[in-house]
């Protein structure tokens, strides 16, 4: 009996040793560090339909661009058909003195101006950009250029159909901007203003220009409009253009009091010069041009 107990103890001990050895053999594998799975890049956010999320369109008010030339307050309009991919024409417009930047209380005062709104109401869908600058000299001209380039880089803009339109102080600004960077603009509407830029670069790049000034303009006077026309015409001739070619890209209109009276303006012809933005044929003339 004692021998049987001894044999059973030996058998039980051997079994325990065998189990312990198996457990120790399995331990390293169970504790081995498992390599992490490769990170999967997240999918782009899409709308429930599977299409990219829609782009905000309409009027985007009172934005700020911190540029190399300083702070640029601006607003812009994206037509409903803008999708962020299909390039559209763009019009850069600058208002007169009374709608420039004079602090927060003046912010957005350019948005009910006909010179901004008119382009949004045409059959041709266009991006419209307007800044409120603080002067009408070289600083403002370079800010207008910087804003134009910002939109060319960050929005779907047809680079061959970028236009400018300036009234009064805004015209002084944009006449310089167009002369400094004529490669950016296809056509320019110069309304009730004086020309402060050079002529030769505009002609050499073939920028189309429409000059508008009331014959009775009390601030600048029609002589400055004619001087701008003559300077540009001479520059086009010097660049080798024939007169009929010049006529296709350079226009001037200095309407008289009767013309203005037909449009409800009987005084303050400088301020009344804003009616040019109601002349659809002039706006469409601007938009008909592409960069050469």
Where are these regions (language model features)?
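Short, proline-enriched alpha-helix->beta-strand connector loops that line the catalytic pocket
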Residues: 124, 203-209
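Gly/Ser-rich "nucleophile elbow"/oxyanion-hole loop immediately N-terminal to the catalytic nucleophile
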Residues: 81-86, 136-168
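Bacterial N-terminal signal peptides
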Residues: 7-19
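A domain-start/cap signature at the N-terminus of enzymes
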Residues: 22-88, 172, 176-177, 237-249
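Primarily recognizes the serine-hydrolase "nucleophile elbow" in alpha/beta-hydrolase
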Residues: 153-154, 160-204
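Short alpha-helix in the alpha/beta-hydrolase fold that links the catalytic acid
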Residues: 106-107, 220-238
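C-terminal catalytic histidine-bearing segment of alpha/beta-hydrolase fold enzymes
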Residues: 212, 216-218, 236-292
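Active-site machinery of serine-nucleophile hydrolases
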Residues: 90, 94-145
